[in-house]
Each structure stands twice: as C-alpha cells, then as structure tokens.
Amino acid sequence: MTQVPDNLKYNRTHEWTRLEDDGTLTIGITDHAQSELGDLVFVETPTVGRHYDAEEACAVVESVKAASDIYAPVGGEVIEANSELQDSPELVNTDPYGEGWIMRIRPDDSDDLEQLLDPEDYQDLVADEE
C-alpha cells in the first residue's frame, strides 16, 4: 500500500510538497512514484538560486527502469537542493518523505498551494492509475 501522509500536498505528476514554518516548501517524489520507478541510481537536483515556474521540469530521477522529470509544484526560487542524493540516490526509495527530499523552494505565492491535491484526492488519483 502506498504511503500518503496527510500533512502534505500533492500534484498530478507525483511530487509532494510540505509547507515549513518559515514559509518555504520542501518537495520530493511520492512513495507511489519511487515504487513505480524502482531502484534509483541517480538524482539530478535543481540549480540553487534558479526560479522555476509551476509545472516546469526542475530535476530528474533515474532508475534502472527509466528516467523521470520532477516538476515544480508551484512557482518559486530554489533555496536548497538535497546534496545527500548525489552519493545516495536510494534515499528517495527508502525514505521518500524524509531524508529523500529533493529540494526546498521559496514560493512566489503560498496561496498557490491551494491548487495542489489534498491527500484524499491524491489517493484517488493513484487508485485510478492502478
């Protein structure tokens, strides 16, 4: 069964977003996404300091099966990329909602989070895809 934490927001391309206390967003790929991809062998993290628009490709994850773009769920500037993933891409598989986070951004408008899926809607999306 796919883990879908109830304190996160989701988008249709299987990224999760967590609003931090300082107003920044931590972003990664969902448990469903990492499961579908299989064992990750490489993560290309986004460029710190670069601005990405909502739904713009900003990172890449590669597994033994496929490569997949990661999309910015909302517009904003990347303030941190998870450097641990350079040497340990498997963190995305083993802890997708924790140590396997991919980036942190400062959103242009935190109200944009309202456009993302809540956990129940994301679970419905995953169920429809299976």
Curated annotation (Swiss-Prot):
Gene Ontology CC terms, in alphabetical order: cytosol; glycine cleavage complex
Record Gene3D superfamilies: 2.40.50.100
Segments crossing the lipid bilayer: none
InterPro entries in the record: Biotin_lipoyl (IPR000089), GCV_H (IPR002930), GCV_H/Fam206 (IPR033753), GCV_H_sub (IPR017453), Single_hybrid_motif (IPR011053)
Tree of life domain: Bacteria
Xref: SUPFAM superfamilies: Single hybrid motif
Chain segments carrying region Disordered: 111-130
Cofactor(s) this protein requires: (R)-lipoate
Residues bearing PTM N6-lipoyllysine: K65
Keyword Repeat: no
Record text on cofactor binding: Binds 1 lipoyl cofactor covalently.
Listed Pfam families: GCV_H
Lipoyl-binding domain mapped to chain residues: 24-106
Sorted UniProt keywords: Lipoyl
Gene Ontology biological process terms in this record: glycine decarboxylation via glycine cleavage system
Protein role: The glycine cleavage system catalyzes the degradation of glycine. The H protein shuttles the methylamine group of glycine from the P protein to the T protein.
Complex formation: The glycine cleavage system is composed of four proteins: P, T, L and H.
Family membership: Belongs to the GcvH family.
PANTHER family reported for this sequence: GLYCINE CLEAVAGE SYSTEM H PROTEIN, GLYCINE CLEAVAGE SYSTEM H PROTEIN-RELATED
Protein name: Glycine cleavage system H protein
Gene: gcvH
